[in-house]
Amino acid sequence: WRMLWEHNSTIVVMLTKLREMGRDKCHQYWPAERSARYQYFVVDPMSEYSMHQYILREFKVTDARDGQSRTVRQFQFTDWPEQGVPKSGEGFIDFIGQVHKTKEQFGQEGPITI
């Protein structure tokens, strides 16, 4: 969260599921239901939208030192198989398009974090 804050990154792209074929693939680094504090940053989950091929989560991230806050949006692509590639690239292209559309819509100045 500190890296996102320092680089003014308000969009995170995640390309894996948490578990696949019974194995952990990624640690859940975000709070699911209640706010959590990570050093100086309080992360409040605001919303979660499940789409056909991805999940969009929105968080309010507050710097506890000065009270400033930002909205961070996490896009998790869920249609990528553990082995190989998706049957069609269309869903992934749509996903990337939505990420860029969101960046333009909300005027993010910092980089997209992957």
Swiss-Prot record:
Keywords: Hydrolase, Protein phosphatase. Substrate binds at E82. SMART domains: PTPc. Residues 1-114 form the Tyrosine-protein phosphatase domain. It comes from the Eukaryota. Pfam families: Y_phosphatase. Coiled coil: none annotated. The keyword Hydrolase applies. It is an enzyme of class 3 (hydrolase). GO terms for molecular function: protein tyrosine phosphatase activity. It catalyses: O-phospho-L-tyrosyl-[protein] + H2O = L-tyrosyl-[protein] + phosphate. InterPro entries: Prot-tyrosine_phosphatase-like, Protein-Tyr_Phosphatase, PTP_cat. Its EC number is 3.1.3.48. PANTHER family: RECEPTOR-TYPE TYROSINE-PROTEIN PHOSPHATASE, TYROSINE-PROTEIN PHOSPHATASE 1. Belongs to the protein-tyrosine phosphatase family. This is Tyrosine-protein phosphatase 13. It comes from Styela plicata (Wrinkled sea squirt). The gene is STY-13.
